[in-house]
Every structure is written in structure tokens, then in C-alpha cells.
Amino acid sequence: MENTSNPEWCANLEGDYEISQVEKLTTSTLVCWAYQISRGMEYLASRRVVHGDLAARNILLTDNNIVKICDFGLAKNIYNNPEYKKSVKIPVPVKWMAIECVVDGIYSTQSDVWSYGVVLWELFSLSRTPYPEFANFDHIRNKLQSGYRMPCPPYANQYL
């Protein structure tokens, strides 16, 4: 009889591995993940889909370091129009959004590119929250409109 108390799908529960088994995170691993995310987003753009919520929290990683983009709850098909204007007011992840999304509610593949830049910042800061010094929507919007950009993340070198 098979032991079903720890099925294969939950093999990564907290405490089921030893620290010595965990691989060290390297720059090449982060670059590999960044590349895979870019290819996934390139595929979505080729299918005329705007993700609308690209963030590190919406990236899954398989056992063999394959990246999967997930959470398509805010995704839109832009097959007939290269932009999507959001008309319904719902809570959105402002810190990951392009200026045109925050100010005008306009989403496009270019706004996904902005979000990808924030994901890169998350990767190379080892999952720090973007814009940690800004607490509210108005402050972020005003700073971005005045030209503010996040500084280089701590673990990115000049070549990245």
C-alpha cells in the first residue's frame, strides 16, 4: 500500500529538505530565469496577449529550473487593438505597473515590458519589494511622472 501522507505533489513542504541540498543562487541562474521570463513574455506578445500583472510573485519555478509565467487574471487579448483601456476600477499592483497604466489605465505589450523591468529589479535584489520608500498610489504616481526610476538593484552589476 502506497504512503499517501506525503504525496509527490507536496514534496517541497517546509522542512522536507536539508540546507546542504539547496543550491546556491548565482548570477547566471538569475540571468537564466530572466531570459526564460523574457521568452515567455515574447510568446504572449506574439499571441497578442497583455499579461497585465507580471511580477516575481507570478513566476513559478519547476524542480529543474524551468520558469513558468502564471496568474492571468488581469490578462487581455489585444488582437484587434494594440492597447486595452481598463474601465472598471479594481485594485491593481501599482508598483509593477507602467506610468500609462497608473495614470490612464492603458495596457499594452509595452506596459508588460515595464513590468518585466520591475521583475528584473526583483530578481537582482533577491525579492525585495520595489519602491519600498513609497507607501501609497499618489506618491508613486507623482514620483514616476517626475522622472524617478529605481536605483540599480544590489545584486546587478554594471554589465546587466
PLM regions: where:
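Intracellular eukaryotic protein kinase-like catalytic domain
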Residues: M1-L160
